[in-house]
């Protein structure tokens, strides 16, 4: 039996939930939203408590837990590639950092043929439309959107303030809003958390409104096998429910919208016969349309941590001890406050490591505890760390189908650290971070350098540390890029080249990765394209000012000059 809808959306992540909500605002428009994972159980603290962000990455209930092929420039490591599974997608398991990217990211996209209306001032109204910021709207921020954004408050951990001050003392700008007039510099970091201290996933922000509409049908545990075509027109999808092998078909009167993310969107297109013909033929998949860019141009952010012992008992180390956790959990559960109500990434920054970068190429997240992002290898003492990563690596990877079976994972290769620029940026980044960490603001707190450690100094030693310890920031993107060149997959409205009734709308359509975390840009992209699908006039361009570094020096004179090996 085949059901019929106006639109079928594959993937209930940050983009899919945005589209499902906006499309069903129009009376009578019917939407089927398919999600391979399960519901977002509101009583599961693992996905609802911000401070528990490491938990959903463990196991496979909420995480696809992909792995890369052996990465050739990383000692052949198979690197983890976590992706969200369940209503909310990766917004259900991410670190909740609300970072939009740099204005220059979007202005740069808009220089590409066919993407002229992706300038920052074209995108800013859609960032605002999606957002409700807890301290109210302004030219940069929204006050009525589905995404709850919480700003850091006075009285939070003193290490956040010390780390920002250290960045300023090292000669970098101070910014009061990393999503406002000026991204460059050090300052407080906003988070997607509700006023009650809950994770603000897109399932909570968007679907809680939309699922009350009779025109929206949500099916969980629905793994899409393929998009169905008549000629070059997408007319529906075929999917599996749970562990059953029986295929269910649904028809789309208007469009099929693929919102499965930078790994699964190209995988689904390839399985459906849209992709590089040679690859499809090698797997006996009939070619519907030869599109060589599907799965190519894959990008990500790589990062590593510099960890320090803390000489005062102000870090979050006690919260890692089991006997302190019940009280933290109770305060969060009943009051929505306390340590549990924050992702603990409440300060960060963006800098240019060299003058040839026109906008920041290094991002910092500061964390007032020394531990791996996935919750492993917690240092058994008071400590703090800086996450440091490069933003626009020239390295490019790919996603390739390995079989026709929808349950099989694809072959993923990011090709991390494939260029000399990558190594230069990470070496510079480690050395600049050490200089920041040696500034007077951290004197009351800074103990020994735990990692990499004082003996890791030469280029060769740093490179070895990077190869062994750098890890993904979980920002895969760009594998179905927008544009008009021969490797582009979609146009500036997400429509797949050479096809009718088929769009891709998610982080995979970014042509070049943005400067920062990807959840906010992904929601913006979906908000913007939703207006196109609905035939609405785009929101008027913003007239807000924004910072362009121009000839400004990368930084001023540091308060404390630090020699290359000083610790």
From Swiss-Prot:
GO cellular component: membrane
Known catalytic reactions: choline + A = betaine aldehyde + AH2; betaine aldehyde + NAD(+) + H2O = glycine betaine + NADH + 2 H(+)
Pathway involvement of the protein, from the record: Amine and polyamine biosynthesis; betaine biosynthesis via choline pathway; betaine aldehyde from choline (cytochrome c reductase route): step 1/1
Residue positions binding FAD: 6-35
Sorted UniProt keywords: FAD, Flavoprotein, NAD, Oxidoreductase
UniProt xrefs under PANTHER family: CHOLINE DEHYDROGENASE, MITOCHONDRIAL, GLUCOSE-METHANOL-CHOLINE GMC OXIDOREDUCTASE
Purpose: Involved in the biosynthesis of the osmoprotectant glycine betaine. Catalyzes the oxidation of choline to betaine aldehyde and betaine aldehyde to glycine betaine at the same rate.
Listed name of the protein: Oxygen-dependent choline dehydrogenase
Organism: Pseudomonas fluorescens (strain SBW25)
């Amino acid at each position: 039996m085949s059901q019929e809808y106006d639109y079928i959306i594959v993937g209930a992540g940050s983009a899919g939930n945005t589209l499902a909500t906006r499309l069903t605002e129009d009376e009578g428009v019917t939407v089927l939203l398919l999600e391979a994972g399960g519901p977002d159980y509101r009583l599961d603290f693992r996905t609802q408590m911000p401070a528990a962000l490491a938990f959903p990455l463990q196991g496979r209930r909420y995480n696809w837990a992909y792995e890369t092929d052996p990465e050739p420039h990383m000692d052949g490591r198979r690197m983890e590639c976590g992706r969200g599974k369940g209503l909310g997608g990766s917004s259900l398991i991410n670190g909740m950092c609300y970072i939009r990217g740099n204005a220059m990211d979007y202005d740069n996209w808009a220089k590409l043929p066919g993407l002229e209306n992706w300038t920052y001032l074209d995108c800013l109204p859609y960032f605002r439309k999606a957002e409700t910021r807890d301290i109210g709207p302004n030219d940069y921020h929204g006050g009525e959107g589905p995404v709850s954004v919480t700003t850091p408050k006075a009285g939070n951990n003193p290490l956040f303030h010390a780390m920002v001050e250290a960045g300023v003392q090292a000669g970098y700008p101070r910014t009061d809003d990393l999503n406002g007039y000026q991204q460059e510099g050090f300052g407080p970091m906003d988070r997607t958390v509700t006023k009650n201290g809950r994770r603000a996933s897109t399932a909570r922000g968007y679907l809680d409104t939309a699922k009350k509409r009779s025109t929206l049908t949500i099916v969980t545990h629905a793994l899409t096998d393929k998009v169905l075509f008549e000629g070059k027109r997408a007319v529906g999808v075929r999917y599996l429910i749970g562990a059953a092998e029986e295929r269910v078909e649904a028809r789309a009167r208007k469009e099929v919208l693929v919102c499965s993310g930078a790994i699964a969107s190209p995988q689904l297109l390839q399985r459906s016969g849209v992709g590089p013909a040679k690859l499809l033929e090698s797997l006996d998949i009939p070619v519907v349309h030869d599109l060589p860019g599907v799965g190519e141009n894959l990008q990500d952010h790589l990062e590593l941590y510099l960890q320090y012992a803390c000489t005062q008992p102000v870090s979050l180390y006690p919260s890692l001890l089991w006997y302190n956790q019940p009280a933290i959990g109770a305060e969060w559960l009943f009051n929505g406050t306390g340590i549990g109500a924050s992702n603990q990434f409440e300060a960060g920054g963006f800098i240019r490591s060299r003058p040839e970068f026109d906008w920041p190429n290094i991002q910092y997240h500061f964390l007032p505890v020394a531990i791996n992002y996935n919750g492993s290898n917690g240092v058994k003492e008071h400590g703090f760390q800086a996450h440091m990563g490069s933003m626009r690596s020239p390295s490019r990877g790919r996603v390739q189908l390995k079989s026709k079976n929808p349950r099989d994972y694809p072959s993923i290769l990011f090709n991390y650290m494939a260029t000399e620029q990558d190594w230069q940026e990470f070496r510079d980044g480690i050395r600049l971070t050490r200089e920041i960490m040696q500034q007077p603001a951290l004197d009351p707190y800074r103990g020994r350098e735990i990692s990499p450690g004082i003996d890791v100094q030469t280029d060769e030693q740093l490179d070895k540390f990077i190869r062994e310890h750098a890890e993904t920031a979980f920002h895969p993107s760009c594998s179905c890029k927008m544009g008009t060149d021969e490797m582009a997959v979609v146009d500036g409205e997400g429509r797949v080249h050479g096809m009718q009734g088929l769009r891709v709308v998610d982080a995979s359509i970014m042509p070049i990765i943005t400067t920062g975390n990807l959840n906010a840009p992904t929601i913006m992209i979906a908000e913007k394209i939703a207006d196109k699908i609905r035939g609405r006039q785009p929101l008027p361009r913003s007239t807000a000012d924004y910072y362009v570094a121009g000839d400004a020096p990368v930084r001023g004179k540091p308060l404390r000059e630090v020699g290359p090996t000083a610790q």
